[in-house]
Amino acid sequence: MEVKGEIYRVAGPVVTAIGLDAKMYDLCKVGNEGLMGEVIQIVGDKTIIQVYEETGGVRPGEPCVTTGMSLAVELGPGLLSSIYDGVQRPLHVLLERTGGFIGRGVTADGLDHKKLWEFKPVVKKGDRVIGGDVIGVVQETVNIEHKIMVRPDISGTVADIKSGSFTVVDTICTLTDGTELQMMQRWPVRKPRPVKRKLTPEKPLVTGQRILDGLFPVAKGGTAAIPGPFGSGKTVTQQQLSKWSDTEIVVYIGCGERGNEMADVLWEFPELEDPQTGRPLMERTILVANTSNMPVAAREASVYTGMTLAEYFRDMGYDVSLMADSTSRWAEAMREISSRLEEMPGEEGYPAYLSARLAEFYERAGVAETLCGEKGSITAIGAVSPPGGDFSEPVTQNTLRIVKVFWALDAKLSQKRHFPAINWLNSYSLYKEDLNDWFTENVAPDYVPMRERAMDMLQTESELQEIVQLVGSDALPEEQQLLLEITRMIREIFLQQNAFHPIDTYSPFEKQYKIMKAIMKWGDAAMDALKSGVLSSEILKMQSKDELPKVKFEEDFEGSLNAVLAKMDKEFAALGGK
């Protein structure tokens, strides 16, 4: 039911209205142009609304109407391959209506209400259905079967169910109590979709990035943060995860970042093949674009919109990865709204509820047994952009308290052109112990001990570097000089990865394991040769050592690696004979 009031005060994106009989988080139409807004505070007869569009020119006395509904998204066939703004308006529809720049007060349906979809029922007349049950399927893309579910708050007995081509708003099923079900359902973005129970993550998210999979794995259904200063590679890392992670669905939220970065995704994804299915990556992707030049308040909506879309596909039993780039921009939007509301500021001006909002977002991730008995997951990966790369600032610190994987990007590494610029000494993963059994069974029995050994070597290298900077590497014992060479190989061959190289951009587990195994084999053989009296200068002259870095770029990886390993054995045999 619509209730009409009038605007009392305007302060940027925050509008105060009087005479509105509204409740918290009601959706409102503000001003003569009907700008979209949401009730965020009610004080006596004054209703405070955050507006998701530019409020220039809005003045006191203009009408303000509450719709009686919360901000909700449309869920159904047609979501995949779409690009939305923060409040689920399809950008291609807005382009047709208003041109290159989004006009004010423009509304657009999240799904195409005219497109026909082939619906195949999986229940029959007389079947009892409850919230979350699948009543039929639609083949949305070649690989994704879109399951049409009963809304979580509806249950009953099927009186009639249809089969054939329908739009998302056509009635496809009627229950005995008269409830009509469509392929589309609306769901409030701030309300988490219910599940039967949460489960413990047991499998890793395979990203194809060696430093992430090898040293700091994230579980499917886990949470991770990528903090880093400007230019250290947050967006490229996020895009790599979107491209190559082994989930069925990817939701990419560009929250307050540059528009060009979203344009990159739109150019690249249709051209790239999903390594699991061989289909274009765009077919499994939903983009929520809320770029830096779009209204500040809509950044908050974009994060919740993206998470609700991810939960919907999780409820079908799919594994979803959600990328939020960047949560810092969302926090800055909260800070701006909070200051407009004249709330007491917390640390660095951020609102006192910053940590609660971040926790609310990340807690919606996880592995779950859905209402229809399927097992689905959401892996949430948030980029954090601390000013000046200062990890002690509130957004980074509050995120660290919540997430279980921390991939710390380092400006010094990026300046040395070491990419991904993830600092292996500052980063960590709390899923390592949970995933060790999976790695032992599915990769190799010696994978976990080899990984730990590599980490110990890198740790020792950082301690030796202090001495090297003072007196040079020649002052070290030969054994330690050799250790520095092995760790250099680990860094340059294993940890460095070229995101723009057609072969090196994606590295499957088997390839990762064989590269690390080859480095360790060279290291062990070199140490043995040193102990048998061979000079380190002789060992470092070996050709196979210089050829090993090229192997990861070769299309015939197996053949190239075997050739280098054979040469390595030959050279060490020749050294031993001296």
From Swiss-Prot:
It is a peripheral membrane protein. It catalyses: ATP + H2O + 4 H(+)(in) = ADP + phosphate + 5 H(+)(out). GO terms for biological process: proton motive force-driven plasma membrane ATP synthesis. PROSITE patterns: ATPASE_ALPHA_BETA (PS00152). One of its GO terms (cellular component) is proton-transporting two-sector ATPase complex, catalytic domain. Keywords: ATP synthesis, ATP-binding, Cell membrane, Hydrogen ion transport, Ion transport, Membrane, Nucleotide-binding, Translocase, Transport. GO terms for molecular function: ATP binding; proton-transporting ATP synthase activity, rotational mechanism; proton-transporting ATPase activity, rotational mechanism. Has multiple subunits with at least A(3), B(3), C, D, E, F, G, I and proteolipid K(x). This organism has both a Na(+)-translocating F1F0 ATP synthase and this H(+)-translocating A1A0 ATP synthase. HAMAP family: ATP_synth_A_arch (MF_00309). Component of the A-type ATP synthase that produces ATP from ADP in the presence of a proton gradient across the membrane. The A chain is the catalytic subunit. This is A-type ATP synthase subunit A. It comes from Methanosarcina mazei (strain ATCC BAA-159 / DSM 3647 / Goe1 / Go1 / JCM 11833 / OCM 88). The gene is atpA.
